[in-house]
Amino acid sequence: MTRREMLTAFCKAGVPENAFWLGKITEAENVNGIAIEGNAWIVYYRSEGQLSNVYHCATQEEACDELFRRIMNVR
């Protein structure tokens, strides 16, 4: 799945495009986001503006699912 496909899937599910970031760690850790480090997909999740959880996932799909669940639980 490409970055554009992930963005499209999240937006179609009702998640605002400015609610998450997919890309570099420096940007992803400052918002709800997914970044790649080595072979790991890392999910950064913020609650009330504070970094509250970091999840290490084995696959892109797992990372997308985790971030999606976190964002949708907040809404």
Go through each PLM region and give its residues:
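Short, exposed beta-strand "edge-strand" segments with a Pro/Gly-rich flavor and a Y/T-containing core
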Residues: 1, 52-58
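Generic structural signal for short, solvent-exposed loop/turn connectors between secondary structure elements
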Residues: 1, 74-75
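Negatively charged, low-complexity tracts enriched in Asp/Glu with abundant Ser/Thr
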Residues: 1-26
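A general marker of short, structured functional hotspots
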Residues: 6, 16-17, 40-41, 51, ...
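Short aromatic-glycine-(Arg/Gly/Cys) micro-motifs in beta-strand/loop hairpins
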Residues: 25-52, 70
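A short, charged, amphipathic alpha-helix used as a generic interaction element across diverse proteins
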Residues: 56-74
